[in-house]
Design a protein with these regions (language model features):
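Surface-exposed, charged secondary-structure patches
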Residues: 57-106
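Short, charged/polar low-complexity linear motifs in solvent-exposed/disordered segments
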Residues: 54-56, 102, 144-147
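Low-complexity, intrinsically disordered terminal/linker segments enriched in charged
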Residues: 107-155
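Core segments of small alpha/beta cavity-forming domains
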Residues: 1-76, 155
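A generic structural signal for ordered secondary structure
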Residues: 22, 83, 125-127
Length: 155
């Protein structure tokens, strides 16, 4: 594994963009809006979101709050800037079946999530990948909703 690049060249505006994308991606997933996701993520990520939207199991995610973020790796490749950002955020989240029955989670409780989101700058930053943070299990394995899961707004 190559060592992480030093986080140089990122500006406060870049950090605001990453936090904004966290909120915007969750909002677009809540609305099941692939068109909105097309302006927030790469075509490959939009395809993954679309595949998850077709599931009979979906997430209800509300009140996403970014707690901490730090650059993990920043690099340029083929003339494009990339950044992997470790994010810790909390949200209210439940996993429901197609009938709206809660399978996992509690509507009144908050869950804390740690993930690394990778972005690519194509004029503006776009979401390129989401990975569980090192040393943590995948949210799906814990029964915790994922940003890319089928997400509906809370009733």
């Amino acid at each position: 594994m190559a060592p992480a690049a030093r986080p140089t060249g990122l500006t406060p505006a870049d950090h605001r963009a990453y936090g904004g994308l966290l909120a915007d991606v969750h909002a677009a997933c809540n609305a099941q809006d692939l068109d909105a996701l097309g302006g927030l993520a790469t075509p490959e990520m939009v395809e993954q979101f679309g595949d998850r939207f077709a599931s009979d199991v979906y997430d209800v995610v509300t009140d996403v709050r970014l707690r901490r973020m730090r650059p993990v790796r920043v690099w340029s490749e083929n003339g494009l800037d990339h950044a992997t950002i470790h994010m810790r955020y909390s949200m209210t989240a439940v996993v429901c079946d197609g009938y709206g029955r809660v399978l996992h989670g509690a509507r009144a409780g908050r869950v804390t999530v740690e993930e690394s989101w990778t972005y690519v700058r194509c004029g503006r930053w776009l979401l390129e990948a989401i990975q569980p943070a090192s040393g943590t299990r995948d949210r799906a394995a814990r029964g915790t909703p994922a940003a890319g899961s089928f997400v509906r707004s809370a009733p």
